């Protein structure tokens, strides 16, 4: 932030070009705190560990790629290439360690405070042919022994030649199969492309039709397509079956009770006045029965709208509160 203001935007009123750059005027380095030891030839940089190492102070493992704030300094030269020293501190302890680059071997040297982690590799675990596997003997250091190793390697190649041939045959069959698959795929590439594009067009039309159908029903979210399992599951669902069955049973029970309470002997008067009186009495009795049943029974009241008016009957006695228990 300070560098941006000093170089691009802000110039103090007492500054003029005769006093040099703004950094010279303020007595600052353009790298700010990173150059606090620039008088000693040291620059603070961000150093990334090139390989896995062990810290000799706390025996902590430091993986490849871990970054440190390091002091970079030129200590020597290899021809025209500079040899830099990188000094840094361990994250887990106060141990200081130093690393130098090695231009001659294009590698890094551990000077102090670190030990390189040795990663063992077993070539037999890999799928390389045995002719590519080279075995080294650390105890033989003279030229004669090196020549013997070359001879042994040659004999080893001859011994494992048969295994290499068999493995090559297996790999060649796999390669031939892959080549055949690719050939079959590309032999009619235009026709296959036409079929694929046609299927895409048909699928797009089907999706558009389905989207319009859902919009017509007010469905504004995408739904999955129906399948037979969904249809079978929907058929097995029975909505309010218990309620409908209960209403039917209550209706039948009401009919039976009305029949039981009808008078056995019906009126045989021939006089119209007597008939009118009897009809009025029957209507009054039916209304009383309906009121009593509505009040004291457990039958659904909606059943009276259809059943009681159609099946008029004469009832000589009322129901008790525990009629249908």
From Swiss-Prot:
Keywords from the UniProt entry: Coiled coil
Coiled-coil parts of chain: 156-262
Any single GO BP term: RNA splicing
Pfam families found in the cross-reference section: Saf4_Yju2 (PF04502)
GO cellular component terms given for this protein: post-mRNA release spliceosomal complex; U2-type spliceosomal complex
Keyword set includes DNA-binding: no
InterPro entries to which the protein is assigned, alphabetical: Saf4/Yju2
Family the entry assigns: Belongs to the CWC16 family.
Protein name in UniProt: Coiled-coil domain-containing protein 130 homolog
Organism encoding this protein: Dictyostelium discoideum (Social amoeba)
């Amino acid at each position: 932030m300070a560098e941006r203001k000093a170089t691009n935007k802000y110039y103090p009123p007492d500054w003029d070009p005769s006093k040099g750059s703004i950094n010279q005027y303020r007595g600052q380095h353009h790298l700010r705190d990173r150059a606090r030891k620039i008088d000693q030839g040291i620059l603070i940089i961000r150093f990334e560990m090139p390989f896995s190492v062990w810290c000799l102070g706390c025996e902590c493992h430091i993986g490849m790629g871990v970054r440190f704030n390091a002091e970079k300094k030129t200590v020597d030269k290899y021809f025209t290439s500079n040899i830099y020293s990188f000094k840094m501190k361990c994250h887990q302890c106060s141990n200081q360690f130093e690393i130098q680059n090695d231009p001659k071997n294009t590698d890094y040297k551990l000077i102090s405070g670190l030990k390189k982690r040795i990663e063992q590799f077993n070539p037999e675990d890999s799928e390389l042919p045995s002719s590519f596997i080279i075995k080294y003997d650390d105890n033989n250091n003279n030229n004669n022994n090196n020549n013997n190793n070359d001879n042994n390697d040659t004999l080893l190649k001859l011994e494992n030649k048969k295994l290499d041939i068999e493995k090559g045959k297996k790999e060649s069959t796999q390669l031939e199969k892959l080549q055949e698959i690719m050939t079959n795929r590309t032999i009619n590439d235009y026709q296959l492309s036409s079929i694929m594009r046609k299927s895409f067009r048909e699928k797009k039309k089907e999706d558009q039709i389905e989207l319009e159908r859902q919009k017509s029903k007010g469905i504004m979210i995408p739904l999955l397509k129906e399948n037979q399992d969904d249809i079978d599951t929907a058929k097995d669902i029975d909505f309010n079956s218990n309620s409908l069955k209960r209403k039917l049973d209550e209706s039948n029970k009401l009919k039976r009770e009305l029949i039981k309470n009808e008078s056995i002997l019906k009126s045989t008067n021939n006089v119209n006045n007597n008939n009118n009186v009897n009809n009025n009495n029957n209507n009054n009795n039916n209304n009383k029965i309906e009121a009593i049943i509505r009040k004291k029974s457990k039958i659904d009241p909606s059943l009276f709208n259809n059943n009681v008016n159609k099946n008029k009957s004469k009832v000589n006695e009322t129901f008790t509160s525990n009629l249908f228990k």
